[in-house]
Amino acid sequence: MNGNLDKKNGFLYAKAAVAALCGAFTAAFGWLGWLVLAWAACMALDWLSGSAAAASRGEWSSAAARAGIWHKAGMVVVVCVAALTDLVLNVAVENLPAFGDGVGFDFEGVVLPVVLVWYIFTELGSIAENAAAMGAPVPGWLVRILAQGKEGAEK
């Protein structure tokens, strides 16, 4: 009986710790932090699933894996550019004399979230393609939703 209670308490402590970490992360980084985390997870899963798909076909090579990592590094650069673009736009909106005392609203940024969403949909589409290359059936409607999400972010 006591062992069961300890297992339940351990599970409750683990749930409380996860909830506390998620709350602290949200307090520190807000919804944008979760978007960045989702993008990073998608990048990692895409690289892993791409490597697995290549290995399943007997086509894995360290050169191709390195090229994939460089591709991901380029994406990080683009996300940094988007973040800096939002920062510059925010400073301009709040401080340029042409706007007087600003434009009367807070500019929290739109470039970075749109770039992140576009990359997330791109990565998810690639992950689905990798899964199909490994032999997993991928519903056509899922592929269409991912394509529409990417197109929507491009507009």
Positions of the model-derived regions?
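Membrane-proximal cytosolic segments adjacent to transmembrane helices
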Residues: 1-14, 101-104, 121-155
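Alpha-helical phosphate/pyrophosphate-handling elements in metalloenzyme active cores
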Residues: 11-27
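Hydrophobic alpha-helical transmembrane segments
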Residues: 13, 17, 36, 40, ...
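Transmembrane helix interruption/hinge and helix-loop junction motifs
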Residues: 27-35
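Alpha-helical transmembrane segments of multi-pass membrane proteins
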Residues: 39-49, 75-86, 115-126
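Membrane-helix exit/interface motif
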Residues: 52-59, 80-97
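Juxtamembrane helix-capping/reentrant segments at transmembrane boundaries
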Residues: 57-79
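Hydrophobic alpha-helical transmembrane segments and immediately flanking/interface helices
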Residues: 91-124
